[in-house]
Amino acid sequence: MGIIRELPEQLANRIAAGEVVERPASVVKELVENAIDAGATKVDVDLQEAGIRLIKVRDNGHGFHEEDAARAFLRHATSKIRDEHDLFRIRTLGFRGEALASIASVSHVLLKSKRADEDGFEMTLEGGVVKETNPTATNVGTEIAVSQLFFNTPARLKYLKTSATELASITDTLNRLALSHPEIRFTVFHEEKELLRTNGNGDLKQVMLAIYGRQVAAQIVTASSKTSDYTLSAHLVRPEVTRSNKQYVTLILNGRSIKNFALTQSVLEGYHTLLPIGRYPIAVLEVKMDPMLIDVNVHPTKREVRLSKEKELCQLIRETVQLTLREQRLIPSVKQEPKLKRVTPSEQSKLDFSMEPQPKQADSVEWNYPIPRERKETLTSPSQWNPAPLVHEPEAEMIEPEQVEESVRQSERLPALDVIGQLHSSYIICGAEDGMYVMDQHAAQERIKYELFYEQLGRPEKEYQLLLIPLTLEFTQEETLAIEEVLPLLAEAGITLEPFGGNTFLVREIPTWYPQHDLEGTIRDLVEMAIQQRSIDIAKYREEASILMACKRSIKANHPLNMEMMRQLIDDLSRTTSPFTCPHGRPILVKWSTYELEKLFKRVM
């Protein structure tokens, strides 16, 4: 007698729920996506006990036909695709027909729905089994209440995180859905406390304001670019505002929030050298593309996708972010915070929550980038990439690629700075028409040397000079074996190691632009970096080698400079492509405006 048998429907649904319904946030995601697919313009979410006791989602979509309601809770039952060809042109968020069946199998469900031309009804399910269906009075749309989640799978309930953690996961899920659909009005409550409210007017900036707050919204820069396959719209937050992890980079493909390591990495590369190590940006990128180029049928959660032209999209994102941020004048400005004042209940009704700037009085310090004054300049980049066509608000016209190559609109670079002196042999004090600037001399020269070394390392033909006395370098046996594997990488950096017996190598020539001070130390550092990297990634090695040499060969703090040296440093900095941060993302200049200085001295109140 055979031992293989077909599993009962309820057991199969419960097994499938292990993939589809991982936690309360999974239920929220599936229900809200169904509401969006139903054409809703308003979605309300109510939660109790972080969704474990109750998740209620109401929408004003087109609603269910009564005869479709029970069928919707069957496995692989859906209205969104009809045949296998539809899998290659998916335009809805859901399509697998698994979510409702999986959710119902591990919870109690109350469904209320009404179409505009039909009477309303309600259906009750327990553990995936329909208990009753009755007519009811309700508004057009659908309301689904999921209660007692995981009541029949105690092991899954046991391994849920704390309520705070589960609620944070739900909030993140809803934030991404709101960012993906700014045209929909979302309201989210947890035990009568409002967590999110958007106005549904289609303005993504307003959604970012609702989610991230006013400080972030004030630093948003927008850009758009286009290729034959992709249309990209980017909302980037200036590098002044950062976070400690990558989850604040939101990728939206055809209205679907996704996870994709390569695309996220392209965003980070666009911010490269503008952020401190260990800090990450806030950014929302929307991509419109042919559904044929994307495969969302990879995982039941549909967050992971495959792209057929991923490299092209990565390049478009990286170049758009790079060019957009390079056009900004990223000089932090010191501003005074207003003193805290108690507000009486009678005064609360008079508070103004508009985004208009208000005069400030204060004691503490806030870092803000000023709004750039724009002018055209020729863009030169050490990486010599060809920028994608960009358009920035308020202009609403697409720029063709050939136009970008001829003329790239850039914001004003460094202001005209007059050197006043040096502070603590580390900082250069400068005056300008709009205030006072303080420059970090080490960070400034680090940026200058980084771009110099990056350009020189990228040249296919390097000019060499013979050493009067060859440099002898001795390594361990382990290092010697590793060096043999990375000789092509070292050659890219202009280092030719000639075996000299045993674990010894000779260096007979070096590029003419190599720093002469501590030559052996420089070469050893580059060899060590190549050994650690192992893989032959020329671009990455070129980048890291440039940063290493720039950092170690730049003037340090506590190094006195005369007036001519300081002026030369400022002049050299003005010729760089990004004179606002060092290669590690630290600011080079800080500004005190004339107005802020006058406030400090009580000349203005």
Curated annotation (Swiss-Prot):
UniProt entry tagged with the keyword DNA repair: yes
Q: Record's InterPro entries?
A: DNA_mismatch_repair_CS (IPR014762), DNA_mismatch_repair_MutL (IPR020667), DNA_mismatch_S5_2-like (IPR013507), HATPase_C_sf (IPR036890), MutL/Mlh/PMS (IPR002099), MutL/Mlh/Pms-like (IPR038973), MutL_C (IPR014790), MutL_C_dimsub (IPR042120)
The UniProt entry, under SMART domains, shows:
DNA_mis_repair, MutL_C
Name any one GO molecular function. Answer: ATP-dependent DNA damage sensor activity
Q: Which Pfam families match?
A: DNA_mis_repair, HATPase_c_3, MutL_C
Q: Specify whether Nucleotide-binding is a keyword of the entry.
A: no
Annotated GO biological processes are: mismatch repair
Provide the alphabetized UniProt keywords: DNA damage, DNA repair
What's in the GO CC field?
Answer: mismatch repair complex
| Similarity comment text for this entry | Belongs to the DNA mismatch repair MutL/HexB family.
The job of this chain, per UniProt, is described as: This protein is involved in the repair of mismatches in DNA. It is required for dam-dependent methyl-directed DNA mismatch repair. May act as a 'molecular matchmaker', a protein that promotes the formation of a stable complex between two or more DNA-binding proteins in an ATP-dependent manner without itself being part of a final effector complex.
Instruction: Please report the name of this protein according to its UniProt entry.
Output: DNA mismatch repair protein MutL
Q: By which gene is this protein encoded?
A: mutL
